[in-house]
A protein has these predicted regions:
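Flexible, glycine-rich terminal cap/loop adjacent to redox cofactors
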Residues: 4-118
Length: 118
């Protein structure tokens, strides 16, 4: 397998808490929600939930990750209103591709190992 075959196309969705009605209602608009998705498999690779109710939101994302299911499962789910987690479908609907990383420089040669002394 070549190195280029190992490169995944990643997508990211970010939502500031200033756009979340429940957070505005509580006056806790600091922070954000961010999700990283493999575009080819549609699997959620990770999330950063630096926000109010992040400890509750994470469970729906973890369930989809543990099941190896597509992010579309949680995107299409019915979320209760008014909650912070009701914005997960909107967050996942805003996924955009990340630019590819530059190639890594070649590794330096490995020096020879001296023979063992008896």
């Amino acid at each position: 397998m070549t190195a280029s075959a190992l490169v995944a196309v990643l997508c990211v969705g970010v939502m500031p808490m200033t756009r979340v009605g429940r957070a505005r209602e509580r006056g806790e608009t600091q922070g954000f929600m961010k999700v990283l998705v493999d575009a080819q498999t549609e699997r959620i690779l990770g999330a950063s939930l630096l926000c109010i109710e992040g400890d509750e939101i994470v469970h729906s994302l973890l369930d989809v990750m543990a099941a190896g299911a597509s992010y579309r499962v949680v995107q299409r789910a019915v979320h209760i209103h008014p909650t912070v987690s009701e914005l997960i479908p909107t967050l996942l609907g805003q996924l955009v591709p990340l630019p590819p990383l530059p190639p890594l420089p070649p590794l330096p040669p490995v020096p020879p190992v001296p023979p063992l002394q008896a």
